[in-house]
Every structure is written in structure tokens, then in C-alpha cells.
């Protein structure tokens, strides 16, 4: 066990706590957090590297799409801290959806008519259990901000979004889960006319790595990329 993790286990109470996020883009949002694995959410360092781009890309967005909501901090951000007219959220994990629902209630957003949530997987085909981002093409206005965090299915999501990605003024924030997928996503978006940028991990990640799951698992490859096309935002 790393020294910081050991100290944390000695001083932090076990279990789920209702918390208000202290700093960063999500500051002020309320979430149910397990400090055994989610202390970084609380202090505001979770995925800190993309906070700047999240704020920049969503500042004038009309629509936000959160693919892989998990417990919903990005969807909560779009609802509570931006003027987007519609938020589409996708999360197939029932436990994560349950946490998201509780987090909506904590933030008094459970009755928002701006939010549409689906439990379907997002990939390249429409079926009973899955859908594509292209299925939204006729329902949305631009500018559009899309966040994708799907634990290895990044290219499946992008291949099912070719029509959507052809719309002007689309901005993307994508977490990649292997060096090979990072390159594949960059090439796909570049070929689709997007300017892209890899967001390097902060220097302090060697001390505070991103963690995931009940087993407090260190993410072996955890980097983000951003992309935009015809939106007047320099990357």
C-alpha cells in the first residue's frame, strides 16, 4: 500500500458520504462519495487535467452528450453550471445509474426537463441493447460538447457518430484507455477534419494517480484527448 493511501485509510471514515466538491470545475456540486476510492472527487483533483477544456467547450454549447456517465459528475456539471438546453446521458451500468439518480436528487435536479438518460450501450449499431450517437442527429442543435469515457469502447462510439461528427461546431473530450486506442482515435478524428490535442497528465499524477473501482485499481493508461472542428476554439 502506498504511504498516502495508508494514511487515508487511517483517518477517513468508511462508507458513502454526502459531500460538496471543494475545488475545480465541479466545485459546489454535491455527490455521494466513498472516500476509500473517491477522495479525489471531493478535493477536486479527479480528472483535473480536462477541467479547463470542459469549461471552455461547454461555455456556449446548446447540447451536451455524456457517454459513460458513471455517477454523473459531468452530466451534473452540464445541468448545474452551463446554459445547455439539452443533456443526453448514457450509462448501461445499473449501479452507476442508481448513484447518478441519488446525485441528481442531492443537487435538486431530479425533475430537470433538460435531461434525457438512456441505459443503452453506445456503439456502432442500433439494437435493443445499444444505440448510436448518430441517432441523435435530428434531435439536437449545435454547438455540441461530447464527453466519452467508455473503458475501451472509444472507437465503437466514434464509428457510430459519423453523421454527428460531420456537423459544424462539435467539441469532444475523450478518455483513452490504451496507447493504441489513443492513436486510433486521433487518426479517426483527424481524418474527419478535427483538430486534436492530447492532454498530458499533470506532473503530480505520480503521487496521486487516477484510481477506479472498488478495488482501488490504478488505471494503467489514463489520458484524455480533446478535438474540435469549425468552432472558433483554438486547440
Where are the regions a protein language model picked out?
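S-adenosyl-L-methionine
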Residues: 1-90, 98-103, 136-139, 199-235
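Short, conserved SAM-binding/catalytic segment
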Residues: 100-115
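Short internal loop-to-helix segment that lines adenine-nucleotide cofactor pockets
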Residues: 42-65, 111-168, 178-184, 188-191
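Conserved S-adenosyl-L-methionine
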Residues: 118, 194-203
Amino acid at each position: 500500500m502506498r504511504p498516502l493511501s495508508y494514511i487515508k485509510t487511517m483517518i477517513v471514515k468508511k462508507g458513502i458520504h454526502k459531500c460538496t466538491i471543494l475545488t475545480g470545475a465541479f466545485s459546489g456540486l454535491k455527490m455521494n462519495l466513498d472516500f476509500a476510492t473517491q477522495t479525489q472527487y471531493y478535493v477536486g483533483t479527479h480528472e483535473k487535467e480536462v477541467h479547463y477544456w470542459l469549461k471552455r467547450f461547454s461555455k456556449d454549447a446548446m447540447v451536451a452528450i455524456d457517454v459513460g456517465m458513471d455517477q454523473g459528475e459531468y452530466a451534473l456539471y452540464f445541468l448545474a453550471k452551463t446554459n445547455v438546453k439539452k443533456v443526453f446521458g448514457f450509462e448501461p451500468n445499473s449501479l452507476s445509474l442508481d448513484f447518478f439518480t441519488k446525485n441528481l436528487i442531492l443537487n435538486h435536479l431530479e425533475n430537470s426537463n433538460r435531461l434525457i438518460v438512456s441505459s443503452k450501450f453506445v456503439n456502432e449499431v442500433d439494437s435493443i441493447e445499444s444505440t448510436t450517437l448518430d441517432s441523435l442527429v435530428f434531435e439536437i442543435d449545435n454547438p455540441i460538447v461530447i464527453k466519452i469515457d467508455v473503458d475501451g469502447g472509444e472507437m465503437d462510439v466514434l464509428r457510430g457518430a459519423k453523421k454527428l461528427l460531420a456537423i459544424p461546431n462539435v467539441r469532444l473530450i475523450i478518455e483513452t484507455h490504451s496507447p493504441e486506442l489513443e492513436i486510433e482515435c486521433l487518426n479517426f478524428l483527424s481524418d474527419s477534419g478535427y483538430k486534436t490535442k492530447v492532454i498530458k497528465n499533470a506532473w503530480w499524477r505520480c503521487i496521486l494517480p487516477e484510481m477506479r473501482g472498488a478495488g482501488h485499481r490504478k488505471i494503467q493508461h489514463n489520458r484524455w484527448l480533446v478535438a474540435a472542428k469549425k468552432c472558433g476554439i483554438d486547440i
